[in-house]
Regions:
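NAD(P)-dependent Rossmann-like dehydrogenase/reductase catalytic/cofactor-binding core
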Residues: 161-164, 171-182, 201, 205-206, ...
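Structural/interface elements that position substrates and couple domains in central-metabolism enzymes
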Residues: 29, 172, 189, 193-199
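NAD(P)+-binding Rossmann beta1-loop-alpha1 motif at the extreme N-terminus of oxidoreductases
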Residues: 1-51, 55
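Rossmann-fold dinucleotide-binding core
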Residues: 115-182, 187-191
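Rossmann-like NAD(P)-binding element
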Residues: 33-40, 51-113, 120
Length: 282
């Protein structure tokens, strides 16, 4: 499957989705609100292609062809004829509602409207449109070119046809899919990692064990490639705190009640690798 894809948001996730899709033969429109954001996104895509070429995993002419299939724009109307639209912006329902309302007015009827959200129920996002049956979750993982999984999420009104189209799209860009049949906040993967990170942070906060030993226990005891606190630093403590707060608000399940230490870290700006300090010093 290949066609025209629109990606809304040129950040790390949006650029990654655009990258793998263009490489798979999709014509991609990458849209963001500023030229600066688009430049950062397209520069990141080119740099990633260059790394794959240098490692012998991609031919230079294929990288050039993929780049040529990406059009960066601030014009939302440029996505009107897309077959698949993937929104990849900040995890805030109000922002997503604004985008989906706008897309609903301009995108052709047969297109699917997908969200890369990792935690917000698709049913809530779809409520901003007049076509909730065409709205589906396509949760990719970072870094998109390296991670194999795509979590497909069915909203309350998502049609079988829309879900099948989303699966064909994800598989066409090299991903293996799991299906979330009931879109509880956090779906499958975010609920699992948030529960693990929250418990690990509570253990560290209460002095049961150090961050290093907690992570080592998960790596050597459970075969995890990375421990939960190192994962939090990589993902961003702020992002995981935001996600677990969303899940807790929705579920009132105490295992998602983040410890005070995580809140204080975020307030202090100690959010992981991107700030130089999180559960570890970087």
């Amino acid at each position: 499957m290949a066609g025209k894809l629109a990606v809304i948001g040129a950040g790390l996730m949006g650029a990654g989705i655009a990258q793998v899709s263009a490489q798979a033969g999709w014509e991609v429109v990458l849209r963001d609100v500023t030229d600066e954001a688009l430049t950062r996104g397209t520069d990141g895509i080119k740099a990633s292609y260059d790394k794959f070429v240098a490692k012998g995993k991609l031919e230079a002419h294929d990288a050039d062809a993929a780049l040529a299939r990406i059009t960066a724009t601030t014009d939302l109307d440029a996505v009107a004829d897309a077959d698949v639209v993937v929104e990849a912006v900040f995890e805030k329902l109000e922002v997503k509602h604004e985008i989906f309302r706008a897309l609903d007015k301009i995108v052709k009827d047969e297109a699917i409207l997908a969200s890369n959200t990792s935690a917000i129920p698709i049913t809530k996002i779809a409520a901003a449109t007049e076509r909730p049956e065409r709205v589906v979750g396509t949760h990719f993982f970072s870094p998109v070119p390296m991670m194999q999984l795509c979590e497909l999420v069915r909203g309350y009104k998502t049609s079988d046809e829309a879900l099948a189209t989303a699966r064909r799209f994800a598989e066409s860009v090299g991903k293996t899919c799991i299906v979330v049949n009931r879109d509880v906040a956090g779906f499958v993967t975010t609920r699992l990692i948030c529960a693990l990170v929250v418990e690990a942070a509570k253990l560290q906060e209460s002095g049961v064990a150090s961050a290093e030993d907690i992570d080592l226990a998960c790596k050597l005891g459970f075969g995890h490639a990375m421990g939960p606190l190192a994962t939090a630093d990589l993902t961003g403590v702020d992002i995981l705190l935001h996600a677990t707060n969303n899940i807790y608000t929705e579920s009132q399940d105490e295992k998602f009640a983040a410890p005070e230490s995580m809140r204080r870290m975020v307030d202090a700006g100690d959010i992981g690798r991107k700030s130089g300090q999180g559960f570890y010093k970087h």
